[in-house]
Amino acid sequence: MASSDGKPGGVFDHHVQTAVCDSRAKYREGRRPRAVKVYTINLESQYLLIQGVPAVGAMKELVERFALYGAIEQYNALDEYPAEDFTEVYLIKFVKLQSARVAKKKMDEQSFFGGLLHVCYAPEFETVEETRKKLQERKAYITRVTKNQDCYMAKKKPVPEQKGTKDSRQGFHPPMPGFGTAALNTSPESPPENSSSCLPYSCEFPLSCFASKSTCSRGEHVDRVSDSCNSARNHGELSRHRDHSAFSPKLQMNTYKNSVPCSSVQEAIATSQAVGRFMPRTTQLQERKRRRDCDRELGTLLETHTSSNEVLIGPKLPGIPTVDLQDDSLNTTATLIRRKLKEVISSVPKPPEDNIKDVCTSHPGKQRRRI
């Protein structure tokens, strides 16, 4: 910064008002002609220098105008600062830097008691401690903003798809060479089809054997292995029975999920299913409406089908007693009327339950007044 006398109260280059930019594009011109100037954190400051204030003793009104944009810590008049005739120069210090930014933007080139104000930053009045604090606050702000942007970019990255669940389970449960061969030799009569290939571990090796291998004796170990072999046979029978049953694949997946002992594997499966099951809210509502319509149409079709081929079970209820009118002509007319009433009653469609609920919950229509 160049100064005329090198003192804080002198005129610096950044105090001089910059000329209006005449090379700005037409579509970028605003209501007021402005200059192009870039401010760094070193040039910005809590101290504002107000030039062009009329010398009519309006310091109180000036401070009140600037106090609208933030708390003011101190203010004073600069008598030694060179100014035009019949004008004064004031120095105002804001508590926050953002308040000084807003006040400079709003009050620069504003009319005040017949004069045109010129507001600029005055960082030369800052102490070393104030400058250090200003730079630290700016550094913390930049760190916070960049961290938020990094988190946002990390959220936008696509989630990598899970590979085959079989590979992931093998990674979670590594093979144990010594114990596995011994257990295989102890159960030669168990058929190979009993071992389920969809499980993350062999049915012949329960987790209790792995957990208690170091604490149990050899006899206890053999007993547990034999118990595990029996449970493996039972599991093979259950699996064969399940194959012949009419359960859906989704139900089998749920039973498998309950049998998986590793919580991390369950979380991975749950996350993969949640990703595949995600749908927008509007799509869910449309799907529900479509299902309701399909169920309604299916119900009407079933009703018409059962009415056409009605199967009576149990004793037949007594019908409407026919009244003898003592006249053949009247009896024929009454029979025709009863038959017509039955046709009308049977042809009336049953309103769906959704429409009944809508009619009940909706407010009654307001009647129009007759004038």
From Swiss-Prot:
Keywords: mRNA processing, mRNA splicing, RNA-binding, Spliceosome. GO terms for biological process: mRNA processing; RNA splicing. The keyword Transcription does not apply. The keyword S-adenosyl-L-methionine does not apply. Residues 157-191, 348-371 are annotated as: Disordered. Residues 158-170 have a biased composition (Basic and acidic residues). It comes from the Eukaryota. InterPro entries: RBD_domain_sf, RBM48, RBM48_RRM. Component of the minor spliceosome. Within this complex, interacts with ARMC7 and PRPF8/PRP8. As a component of the minor spliceosome, involved in the splicing of U12-type introns in pre-mRNAs. Belongs to the RBM48 family. This is RNA-binding protein 48. It comes from Mus musculus. The gene is Rbm48.
